[in-house]
Amino acid sequence: MNIFYYDIAVGLPLRQCFTYKSKVIIKKGTRVIVPFGKKSIVGIVIKKISNPDSLKGLKEIISIADDYPCFDKSSFETILWAADYYHHPIGEVFFSFVPTLLRKNNNKTISALKKFSEYQLNERDKKFKLTKEQKATLSKLNKVKQFSPSLIYGVTGSGKTEIYLQLAEKFIQKNKSILILVPEINLIPQVLKRFKDRFSGEIGVYHSRQTPNQRLKVWLKS
């Protein structure tokens, strides 16, 4: 029988991973339940290792919490980079990217990922005429082919949101996801209304005033 070894990050202020063994292959970024001291906690698989420093005393992974990883490749690598760059415990960094309920060893939340459904978002059949300045700005942004921060400057009511909507439309047509960040919670209703007026389907809202269950449902569908 094959035995595989994995470095696991746990959500504690510890600047190291812990090696566990398993009889199955597990993808990195997957949540697992591991024995830790006298209790069982949630950990995240960081990597598969070939030759552990020592096999003595290695504990076995209790169970696999999810059918698939919590993070795509890009997100996973970004979180690894952030933990290294900011010299912060790797487990705490990883777990800061998942909802509170998914950080706990709870059967109800462990099975939650297996029951999620996707948001369906489609553009409404309505055309909006852009001003000359808006067209020029949108044209420049559409030429960007890689990550690049951009600043759109304008007073309130100058049409910045319409540019965001048009950019969102472009990516929705490519079956991609859109993340809109607002500077404060009080602005969410008006921004949400603009997007609901433009796009049909369900739009997820995620903020600190929601309950853990509400945030979990949105995170699972994103």
Where is each model-derived feature located?
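Accessory, non-ATPase domains that flank or precede helicase/AAA+ motor cores in DNA-metabolism machines
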Residues: 1-222
